[in-house]
C-alpha cells in the first residue's frame, strides 16, 4: 500500500477541484496512482477533469518560423523567466528555429548543424557561459506541404516569432495564397485557444479513447443504467468528446453560429478558389510535461540550522 502524502492530495485537489477528503480517499482506493484516482473521482461524478492540468514547469521560449510551405516550432528552456527576456537568448531561439527549418526536427541534427564557425550545440554552450544559466533545446517539430502553406501563431510574443505558446498549422491547397494565409492565421489562433489533441478521431491515442469509454460506462453502471442503454449513451458521449478534442470537429472560435472547423474550412474554399486540406498542426506550450521542482524555504532553513 502506497503512502498517501499531503502533497499528493494537494496535487489531486488542484487538478480536479474536489475536496481534500474525497481526494485522499481516491488516492487510497487506487494505491497512490494519480491518473487512476482522477478516473475514480470522475466515475463517482465528483470531477470533470480528464487529465492533470498541464502546469508550466520550465522557463524559456517557444520559437515559431515559417517559409511558405514549411514551418517549425522549437522549445528552448532556461532556468528563469528573466533569461527569456534577454535579447541574446531570444536571438539564440530564433537562430535554432532557422536551423530547424533547414535540417528538420531531429535534435541531434540541429545541435550538430553548423552556425558560423561552430555548431548550434556550441552556440548554446556559449550562451550558458555568458548568461550564467543552464539552457537546453528540448524539442522541435516541422510541418511541410507540397502545395499551399504552413501558418503560425505565437501567443503573447515577447519578441517577433517567440513567446510562451506557439502553433503551426499545415494547409494543402492550390488556391489563393492571401486568403489561405488568413485562414491559416485563424486556425493557428484557434489551436492555441482550444488546444485540440488530434486532427480527427482516428488520430487520438486508442488507449486514451478506451479509458474515456470505460470511465463513461462505469459512471452509468453505478447509476443503475441497463447495459443496452449504457452502450448508446457511451456512443453519444464519445461524439461529444471528439467535438471537444479533435480540431476538425471543434466549434470554430471565429464563427458565432457554431460551425465546426471542418465546416469553416469547407466554406473558405469558395474564397480560396480551390479545395483545402488541413494536413496537420503542432501546438507547443512552454514547459508542458516537465515537473517543476519546488522547495519549502522554512524546511531548508531548519535543515541548515540542524533543527527538525
Curated annotation (Swiss-Prot):
Xref: PANTHER family: ELONGATION FACTOR TS (PTHR11741), ELONGATION FACTOR TS, MITOCHONDRIAL (PTHR11741:SF0)
A single Gene Ontology CC term: cytoplasm
Physiological role: Associates with the EF-Tu.GDP complex and induces the exchange of GDP to GTP. It remains bound to the aminoacyl-tRNA.EF-Tu.GTP complex up to the GTP hydrolysis stage on the ribosome.
PROSITE patterns: EF_TS_1 (PS01126), EF_TS_2 (PS01127)
Cystine residue pairs: none
GO molecular function, one term: translation elongation factor activity
Name of the protein described by the UniProt record: Elongation factor Ts
Signal peptide boundaries: none
Organism: Rhodopseudomonas palustris (strain BisB18)
Keyword Protein biosynthesis in record: yes
Keywords: Cytoplasm, Elongation factor, Protein biosynthesis
Principal localisation: cytoplasm
Family annotation (InterPro entries): EF-Ts_dimer_sf (IPR036402), Transl_elong_EFTs/EF1B (IPR001816), Transl_elong_EFTs/EF1B_dimer (IPR014039), Transl_elong_Ts_CS (IPR018101), UBA-like_sf (IPR009060)
Location of this chain's protein in the cell: Cytoplasm
Amino acid at each position: 500500500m502506497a503512502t498517501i502524502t499531503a502533497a499528493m492530495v494537494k496535487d489531486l485537489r488542484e487538478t480536479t477541484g474536489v475536496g481534500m477528503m474525497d481526494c485522499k480517499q481516491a488516492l487510497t482506493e487506487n494505491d497512490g496512482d494519480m491518473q487512476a484516482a482522477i478516473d475514480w473521482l470522475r466515475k463517482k461524478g465528483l470531477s470533470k477533469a480528464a487529465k492533470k492540468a498541464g502546469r508550466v514547469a520550465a522557463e524559456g521560449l517557444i520559437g515559431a518560423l515559417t517559409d511558405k510551405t514549411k514551418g517549425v516550432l522549437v522549445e528552448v528552456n532556461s532556468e528563469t523567466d528573466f533569461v527569456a527576456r534577454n535579447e541574446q537568448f531570444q536571438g539564440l531561439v530564433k537562430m535554432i528555429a532557422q536551423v530547424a527549418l533547414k535540417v528538420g526536427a531531429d535534435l541531434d541534427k540541429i545541435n550538430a548543424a553548423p552556425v558560423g564557425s561552430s555548431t548550434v550545440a556550441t552556440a548554446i554552450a556559449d550562451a550558458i557561459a555568458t548568461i550564467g544559466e543552464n539552457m537546453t533545446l528540448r524539442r522541435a517539430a516541422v510541418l511541410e506541404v507540397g502545395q499551399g502553406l504552413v501558418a503560425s501563431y505565437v501567443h503573447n510574443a515577447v519578441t517577433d516569432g517567440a513567446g510562451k505558446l506557439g502553433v503551426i498549422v499545415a494547409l494543402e491547397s492550390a488556391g489563393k495564397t492571401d486568403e489561405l494565409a488568413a485562414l491559416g492565421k485563424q486556425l493557428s489562433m484557434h489551436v492555441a485557444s482550444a488546444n485540440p489533441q488530434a486532427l480527427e478521431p482516428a488520430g487520438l491515442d486508442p488507449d486514451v479513447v478506451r479509458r474515456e469509454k470505460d470511465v463513461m460506462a462505469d459512471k452509468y453502471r453505478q447509476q443503475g443504467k441497463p447495459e443496452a442503454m449504457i452502450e448508446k449513451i457511451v456512443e453519444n458521449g464519445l461524439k461529444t468528446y471528439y467535438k471537444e478534442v479533435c480540431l476538425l470537429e471543434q466549434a470554430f472560435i471565429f464563427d458565432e453560429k457554431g460551425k465546426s472547423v471542418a465546416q469553416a474550412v469547407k466554406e473558405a474554399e469558395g474564397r480560396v478558389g480551390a479545395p483545402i486540406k488541413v494536413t496537420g498542426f503542432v501546438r507547443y506550450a512552454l514547459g508542458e510535461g516537465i515537473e517543476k521542482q519546488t522547495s519549502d524555504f522554512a524546511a531548508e532553513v531548519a535543515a541548515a540550522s540542524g533543527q527538525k
